[in-house]
């Protein structure tokens, strides 16, 4: 059980971060079968023909600088229960809230740098665009300074994701707790 102070610190961290909502950490989020209809009514892009991959795509359209349904009964179970490594550290007090907020700011700055290097695309999901660009560079014979800079920044961001959020690779499924 999270006490009230830890809970409010967790809320502050989550609401100021949102990387699990914006498509920067995940391509999609899981839904329970009982949540499919309400998620569709909320305007989420739901997919569910395969029970092992039932969910909605990211970025979440209900993220508007912070979650717009955070206190709603329709708030999906996965969203309510997901805890990244950094959040767990704030809850167990091994990382202070101010330090965690600084880390989130670092992540957002790294993402902003990567966004500027990604080609324009109609796809709103950062993670998918990053995967596509890395695959294109891997299959390309061109090895210029721009490609090298992109790969170095992408590698640094992915290592940061792993160390800070415990998101280990580009195509990992969101874990359900």
Question: Model-flagged regions — what are they?
Answer:
Residues 1-177:
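Hydrophobic scaffolds flanking metal-cofactor catalytic centers in soluble metalloenzymes
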């Amino acid at each position: 059980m999270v006490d009230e102070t830890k809970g409010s610190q967790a809320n502050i961290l989550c609401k100021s971060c949102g990387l699990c909502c914006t498509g920067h950490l995940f391509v999609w989020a899981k839904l329970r079968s009982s949540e499919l209809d309400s998620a569709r009514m909320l305007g989420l892009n739901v997919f569910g023909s395969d029970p092992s991959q039932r969910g909605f795509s990211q970025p979440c359209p209900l993220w508007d600088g912070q979650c717009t349904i955070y206190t709603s009964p329709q708030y999906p179970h996965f969203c309510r229960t997901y805890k990244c490594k950094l959040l767990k550290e704030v809850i167990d007090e091994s990382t202070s809230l101010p330090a965690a907020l600084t880390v989130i700011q670092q992540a957002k700055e790294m993402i902003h740098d990567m966004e500027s290097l990604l080609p324009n695309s109609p796809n709103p999901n950062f993670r998918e665009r990053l995967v596509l660009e890395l695959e294109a560079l891997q299959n390309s014979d061109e090895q210029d300074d721009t490609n090298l800079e992109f790969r170095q920044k992408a590698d640094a961001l992915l290592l940061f994701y792993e160390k800070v959020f415990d998101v280990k690779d580009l195509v990992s499924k969101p874990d359900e707790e």
